[in-house]
Amino acid sequence: QVPFGNRETEGIVVDRVAAPERAGDLKSITKVLSVVPIATTQSLQFIDLVAQHFACNPWDLIRSAIPPRVASVDKDFVSGEPSPQMGSKGAIEFHALAPFTQAHEQLVPLVAAHQKAGSILIVAPDEKDVDLVIASLRSVALSPLKLTAALTREERYRNFLFAMHGSNSIVVGTRSAIFAPIKNLATVIVHKESSHDHYELRSPGWNTRTVALLRSKFQSLKLILTGFSPSIEVSQLIDERKVKYLNSKENVNVKAFTPSEGALLPGRIFGDIKKALAVGPVLFIA
């Protein structure tokens, strides 16, 4: 806690030096709120990098990147600088989702294939997608950490610190989780990367995909983007061969019914609709 104008405000101690680098009077720190680190040198450098990219103040990003502190949770964690994040090969891939399988279920083999390399961060568009991904991972005996604003302040802050200090974690969260300083992070997965929910509503309007691309390069992380089709931005990167496009071959059965006498739907189509309804929802596109 430091004095700023006529009030006290929170700050982050980023370094300690023997002598000041600037002339003039310096204000003293009023109070140390916590001895538990909430950021690493690397994560603060990355926030500065993203701030430069979006031409904004780093604090505009810190409010998204670091959850509010809860004093009672700090007592459960030992003070000390978290280990540097290890990184991976830095490859970037777009995995096209198959049409006949639930999207969240298709992340399970991706996680299994990359788990040995280190911790994995999965960023999903919204709370519903996060819960579906977590349920799929738990169905194969994995224990992911949830990191979203829908958690209570205590749960969110606790999980944030667990992600910083735990080893080989699987963290699943919404867009703010892209900044989380996860220990031994090796792989980042941006699920449904073209979703509008990956865009921050507050200034400077950053989005998960762009921040993930910056982080992949900054930390040499493996980055996997998923979706049924790539966004325009990712399509350009695929054309430029900066992103590898991966998909599986799928066969789709197509039936054509010729309308008769101006009917909106041909009579013969209703038998197929009834059969399809026994399996799942039916979508009509006019």
Please identify what each model-predicted range represents.
Residues 1-286:
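Accessory, non-ATPase domains that flank or precede helicase/AAA+ motor cores in DNA-metabolism machines
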